[in-house]
Amino acid sequence: MKMKVYIPKIKNTEKLFFVSYTIYMIAFILNQTFYWRYFPEKMDRYVLLVCVLLLALNEIVSVKIINFRSLIGLIICLLLFAITYSTNGNAVAGMIVFIYCGRNISFEKIAKITIYITVFMLVLITVSSWLGIIENHIDYRGNRARQYLGFRYTLYAPALIYNITLLEIYIKQEKLKWKNIICLLILNGFFFFFTNSRLSFGLSVLSLVIAVIYKYKFVFFNKNHFVYLILVFSYLICSGFFYGLMVTFSRNVLWMKNLNDFLGNRLNLGQYSLLEYGISAWGKQIAWVGNGLDVYGNRATGSYLWVDCLYVQVLQRYGVIFLIIFLLVLTITMWVCYQKKNYMLLMLLSLIAVHCMIDDLQLYLHYNTFWFAIGSLLLGRSKEKYGKLKQMK
């Protein structure tokens, strides 16, 4: 059986965007690996500067007219960029610029390019770690060894695979074949075997189950639009629910204690962080201490304190203003999905909303390509329907 590799056709007006995006993806994936020790300090800022300059040049060359929506979007993006950049959130600052500059490019095309880049980087990094070119750190917990596979934390590689899984599901939709599902299960299982990352593996399996249900029109997918309407508010519901749990958490309440234990102490750590650092309108730099290694394989010193909830991390690091805009924009994006009857995108974004309650990696573009949907749906050219997948080709 021959393997077909389809390379999306890139227009002249898109070339600078994809050059910039490729540089960004490669750099910020490498930033998560032991390869990063060979790069100069603050290399991420230099990369961000180059990417932004390329994107600005592409805007000047390719965009003839800026409509009112694009102008409002630009103002909001500049505000969010300033907030994130000032708190040293280089990857997030870059993400905001890419979301805006990718507004007129097919999300399907971006998704396919992302898959190719990510697969290439995963192969390069994993093989490099096995060949001894970079370190393959191993954690031993109980009777199980967890390999980092060249990354600086065991969860990073599986998180990239999870993103690939969601992108494949969205690209294929009803055309997703059983051989595709089996290949994705094998790929996820491969990285689960070496890293024991249950979260990414479990969510990948869940997303594939949803894809199968959607493919064969089981349960409510054809008629129950009320469920889809509820999904529109996924980000508001998930953020409010988990924040409420953190604020009211008490070990004296048995069900809360059991839930906290099940979630790996996330409620307790989140509450402690809120009490320790508080919240502000514009955010601030916070030196949380996690389990990840530095570029030389050393663990951070100090007591462990990490906030895995994306919503609370955004609230504390980037501030109330950023979080309000973030949730409002995402809710409007979900509403547009509902209006366009793009139910697959609506469901996948809802799954990501749930995932964000317990995993902050979803904030970053190299782990979550679906942020591009914001620009395409809200700021893209009016002639692009962005409804069902076939309308985007």
Regions found by a protein language model. Name each.
Residues 259-318:
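Long extracytoplasmic/lumenal interhelical loops at the membrane interface
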Residues 2-29, 44-63, 68-254, 299-385:
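Hydrophobic transmembrane helix bundles of membrane-integrated enzymes that assemble
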Residues 35-40:
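Membrane-interface helix-loop junction between the first two transmembrane segments
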Residues 32, 276-279, 360:
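A structural signal for alpha-helix termini and helix-coil/disorder junctions
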Residues 41, 45-48, 240-272, 287-293:
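Flexible juxtamembrane loops connecting transmembrane helices in multi-pass membrane enzymes
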Residues 388-393:
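Membrane-proximal cytoplasmic C-terminal regulatory module of class A 7TM GPCRs
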